[in-house]
Regions:
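Signature for HUH/AEP ssDNA processing cores
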Residues: 1-150, 157-163, 231-237
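DNA replication initiation modules
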Residues: 5-9, 13, 94-117, 158-238
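Short Gly/Ser/Thr- and Asp/Glu-enriched loop/turn motifs at secondary-structure junctions
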Residues: 145-152, 185-190
C-alpha cells in the first residue's frame, strides 16, 4: 500500500482502491489539470512566435500553471511514513525521508515528450504487441500521463537484485528505451496525480496491495539515513 498527500501542509494518508479512484476522478482534479495544460500550451505558442515583447506573457502563463500544479494532491508510491511530529509539533505520517517505510514500488518519470502515448508504443515487442501484456511482463503496475500532458509516470515492482530505487529506474529505462529523471531518486518523492482519463494502464489487483519486504528490509535504513544515490556501478544506462 502506498500513500498520498493532499497538499504540502498535510500529513500523508494511505491509498486504497476507493481513495485512488476518488482522487483521479474528482472534478477538481480535472479542472486543475485542464487549467495547467491550457496555460502551458499558451506559453508554448507565445515562445514559438519568438516575439520578445510577449515573452513576459509566456512566463506568466507558466507561473500560473505551476501554481495550479501545487494545488494538486500527490501520490508517494515508493513509501509510507512513520508517525512523527511536524515542525509545529503536530503528529502525523509526515512525508519525511527519515521516517520512510519502503513499499517495494518504484516510480519513474519520463519528461519532455511530445506525445506520451506514442512513447508507450515504443515499448511493445513482437511477443507483446499489447501495452497491458508488456506491462505485466515487466512488472509495471501503473502508467499515466502527467499533469503537463508531456510526461509519463511509470510505477513498477522493485527488484532487489537490481539495486535501490534509482538503480531500478535505470534498469527499467533501459528495457523501455527511455531516459531517467535523476531527480526522482528519493523515497519521499511526490508524484502529482492525474485525471482518470490519463491512465494508460493499471493493474488494480496488485497496485493497492503489493509489497516487497525483502527490498524494504535491505533499503529502509539506507533511505532513512538520507542515502539515495545509485549503488550499482554496472547499472545499464543509455
Amino acid at each position: 500500500m502506498f500513500c498520498y498527500q493532499q497538499n504540502f501542509f498535510n500529513p500523508t494518508k494511505e491509498v486504497d482502491r476507493n481513495v485512488f479512484w476518488a482522487l483521479v476522478g474528482a472534478p477538481y482534479t480535472k479542472e486543475l489539470i485542464d487549467g495547467i495544460r491550457i496555460r502551458k500550451e499558451k506559453a508554448a505558442t507565445i515562445m514559438a512566435a519568438n516575439v520578445e515583447e510577449e515573452q513576459i506573457l509566456a512566463s506568466a502563463a507558466l507561473g500560473e500553471a505551476d501554481q495550479l500544479k501545487k494545488k494538486l494532491p500527490a501520490f508517494i508510491f515508493q513509501a509510507t511514513f512513520d508517525v512523527t511530529k511536524s515542525k509545529k509539533g503536530y503528529e502525523g505520517a509526515w512525508r519525511k525521508q527519515a521516517a520512510t517505510r519502503l513499499t517495494g514500488l518504484v516510480v519513474m518519470d519520463i519528461d519532455h515528450v511530445d506525445n506520451p502515448v506514442d512513447v508507450t508504443r515504443g515499448w511493445l515487442t513482437d511477443d507483446c504487441p499489447c501495452l497491458g501484456d508488456r506491462c505485466r511482463e515487466l512488472g509495471i503496475l501503473l502508467v499515466y500521463v502527467t499533469p503537463s500532458g508531456h510526461g509519463l509516470k511509470v510505477v513498477f515492482k522493485a527488484r532487489t537484485e537490481w539495486g535501490n530505487l534509482i538503480d531500478n529506474q535505470h534498469r527499467m529505462a533501459a528495457l523501455l528505451g527511455v531516459e531517467v529523471d535523476e531527480a526522482c531518486k528519493d523515497a519521499s518523492r511526490m508524484s502529482f496525480i492525474c485525471r482518470k482519463e490519463d491512465i494508460l494502464f493499471i493493474n488494480e489487483q496488485e497496485l493497492f496491495s503489493y509489497e516487497n519486504k525483502e527490498f524494504a528490509e535491505k533499503y529502509n535504513d539506507v533511505y532513512r539515513g538520507g542515502h539515495s544515490q545509485p549503488t550499482l556501478f554496472d547499472t545499464v544506462r543509455r
